[in-house]
């Protein structure tokens, strides 16, 4: 009989399938019951009479039938399926390393073949409600593809902690080791970073270890940690601290005396720990949702550090002011080129310098994706007005917000009225009914229908372009009453309402729009901003709806603005800002 090559489908010694399932034909035979092996391999003299029982004859017939029916493609397919299942088997090995599983005797070739034939005829491989994965496991358990006993080890790859803890004390971090073994010493790396990024390329021999240095570099889980702090000589200084696994523990252990309130700017493997007091002195506006704890809380324990991982426009402002982009770029360049080796690095640098000299580097057809909507137009194309904005101005031309005197009952029961469940949604028609119809703070309020025409307005997705157009189109609409609701990516919301010469803004932290900059650029009228604090998405939606109810009470005159501001800041996790222009 021709020997079957069970290793035909995987010839590379580096593959996990070969390492775990390098079964030769002899190993296959070693695992079979002795009665079949003795029948198949027993030397029978020519012409000799051999006494064979009926059971042996039947088993031998079944075995030969099963072997003859298996083609090379069937065996390869079986091995491929087994290989696909290896990852799961290996990943759970550590989990049950200490458990000794009972050794189960392998079924005979005939029984295995019949079981396989039965499962195939029953449609085991067909998808069903019970799941394909479970049935594939059953197939592998009953097949000849896997033999022997395996301890399932649960392997978890290294990962880096990408989130920033909100606070950490010296007592918590003193026993945490954040050091990462580096090729160069910390003193040498510090010397490099403090000498204007002087060239420091380590030389590697062409051996197996160093040939993987690029892959090792890309899979590193540590962070290059920089500390941005005050300086007695310069406005500020940026120092390289260490290459660590956790910047929070490292900072709390060794830099808590710099400032125990820290803004963290993260770019890939580089993290900048920026002093809160330094940012306050620079005059950079700190968004309410990204602010750190107050002075009283920080002063209670100087060894307890508070951290905020910044993002969006605030992150961009800090990056621009402290030139963090330059530190990131140079650090990334050097560490990446170092991992490539001297020859590749020299080639790339030569090519890049040539591209820099002939300006090709700045004219390549490469474009960074914009954060804003594709609807953004240039100044010359601003004459095109969004249909959404046009409809708002058209259908709100003849309507006004209801005008009422301040109501003591509403003011005294503001918490109950605003937090009461309602059918309010973020559709334009639903918000129009809330703002333009009499607010039913109790059942005796007469109903009206001032918002019928506004139901024709078709809402569009939010963008900076639409916000600017809405403001621009209202420049000459001094006595108009209208509003706009905008939904951005990640369910971020922005509501703007206009009553005569006053605008009311409700928003959280919006990635695509810096509301303060938009108002400063507009430079007209009076603006009241209600900015929702740092909450999750669900809470932000609830708070936005409650602020819409509060806004309706303000616009209809039922609640004085001062009382509304106090309530919003105390009960709705909101910060109020005011901008006024001539």
Curated annotation (Swiss-Prot):
Domain of life of the organism encoding this protein: Viruses
**Pfam families associated with the record:** TATR
PTM notes: Phosphorylated.
Specify where the region named Disordered lies, as residue ranges.
101-131
Q: Where in the cell is it found?
A: Host nucleus
Q: Where are the transmembrane segments?
A: none
A GO cellular component annotation here is: nuclear viral factory
Key words of the record:
DNA replication, DNA-binding, Early protein, Host nucleus, Phosphoprotein, Transcription, Transcription regulation, Viral DNA replication
Disulfide-bonded cysteines:
none
**GO molecular function terms here?**
DNA binding
Question: Which Gene Ontology BP annotations are present?
Answer: DNA replication; viral DNA genome replication; viral genome replication
Q: What is its main location?
A: host cell
Domain remarks: The N-terminal region is required for origin-specific DNA replication and phosphorylation.
Q: Quaternary structure?
A: Homodimer. Interacts with helicase and LEF-3.
Membership in a protein family: Belongs to the nucleopolyhedrovirus IE-1 protein family.
Task of the protein: Regulatory transcriptional protein, which trans-activates gene expression from early baculovirus promoters. Can also trans-activate its own promoter, suggesting an autoregulation during infection of host cells. Also promotes viral DNA genome replication via the N-terminal region.
Record-given protein name: Trans-activating transcriptional regulatory protein
Highest classification ranks of the organism: Viruses, Viruses incertae sedis, Naldaviricetes, Lefavirales, Baculoviridae
Gene that this sequence comes from: IE1
């Amino acid at each position: 009989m021709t020997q079957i090559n069970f290793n035909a489908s995987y010839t590379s010694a580096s593959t996990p399938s070969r390492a775990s399932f390098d079964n030769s034909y002899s190993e296959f035979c070693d695992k079979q019951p002795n009665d079949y092996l003795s029948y198949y391999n027993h030397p029978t003299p020519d012409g000799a009479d051999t006494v064979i029982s009926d059971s042996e004859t039947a088993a031998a017939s079944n075995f030969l039938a099963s072997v003859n029916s298996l083609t090379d493609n069937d065996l390869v397919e079986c091995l491929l399926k087994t290989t696909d299942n290896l990852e799961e088997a290996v990943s759970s090995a550590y989990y049950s390393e200490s458990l000794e599983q009972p050794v189960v005797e392998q079924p005979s070739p005939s029984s295995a073949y019949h079981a396989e034939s039965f499962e195939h005829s029953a449609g085991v491989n067909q998808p069903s409600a019970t799941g394909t994965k479970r049935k594939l496991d059953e197939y592998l358990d009953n097949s000849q593809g896997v033999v022997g006993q395996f301890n399932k080890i649960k392997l978890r790859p290294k990962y880096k902690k990408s989130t920033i803890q909100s606070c950490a004390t010296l007592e918590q971090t003193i026993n945490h080791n954040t050091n990462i073994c580096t090729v160069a010493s910390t003193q040498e790396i510090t010397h490099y970073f403090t000498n204007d990024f002087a060239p420091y390329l380590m030389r590697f021999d062409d051996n197996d270890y160093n040939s993987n240095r690029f892959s090792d570099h890309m899979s590193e889980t540590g962070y290059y940690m920089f500390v941005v702090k005050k300086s007695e000589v310069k406005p500020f200084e940026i120092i390289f601290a260490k290459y660590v696994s956790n910047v929070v523990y490292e900072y709390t252990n060794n830099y808590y005396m710099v400032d125990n309130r820290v803004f963290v700017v993260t770019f890939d493997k580089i993290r900048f720990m920026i002093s809160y007091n330094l940012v306050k002195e620079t005059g950079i506006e700190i968004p309410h949702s990204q602010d750190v704890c107050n002075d009283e809380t920080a002063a209670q324990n100087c060894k307890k550090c508070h951290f905020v991982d910044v993002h969006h426009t605030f992150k961009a402002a800090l990056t621009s002011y402290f030139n963090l982009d330059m530190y990131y770029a140079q650090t990334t360049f050097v560490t990446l080129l170092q991992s490539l080796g001297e020859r590749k690095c020299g080639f790339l640098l030569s090519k890049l310098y040539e591209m820099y000299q002939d300006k090709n580097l700045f004219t390549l057809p490469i474009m960074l994706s914009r954060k804003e909507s594709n609807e953004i137009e240039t100044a010359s194309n601003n004459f095109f007005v969004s249909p959404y904005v046009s409809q708002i101005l058209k259908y709100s031309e003849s309507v006004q917000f209801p005008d009422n005197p301040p109501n003591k009952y509403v003011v005294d029961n503001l918490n109950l009225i605003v937090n009461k469940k309602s059918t309010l949604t973020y559709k334009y028609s639903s918000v129009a009914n809330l703002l333009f119809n009499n607010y039913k703070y109790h059942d005796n309020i007469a109903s009206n229908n001032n918002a019928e025409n506004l139901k024709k307005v078709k809402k569009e997705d939010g963008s900076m372009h639409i916000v600017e157009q809405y403001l621009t189109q209202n420049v000459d609409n001094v006595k108009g009453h209208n509003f706009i609701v905008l939904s951005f990516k990640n369910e971020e919301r922005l509501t703007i309402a206009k009553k005569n010469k006053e605008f009311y803004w409700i928003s959280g932290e919006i990635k695509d729009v810096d509301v303060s900059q938009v108002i400063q650029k507009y430079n007209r009228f009076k603006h009241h901003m209600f900015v929702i604090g740092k909450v999750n998405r669900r809470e932000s939606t609830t708070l936005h709806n409650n602020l819409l109810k509060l806004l309706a009470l303000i616009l209809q005159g039922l609640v004085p603005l001062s009382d509304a501001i106090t309530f919003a800041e105390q009960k709705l996790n909101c910060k109020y800002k005011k901008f006024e222009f001539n």
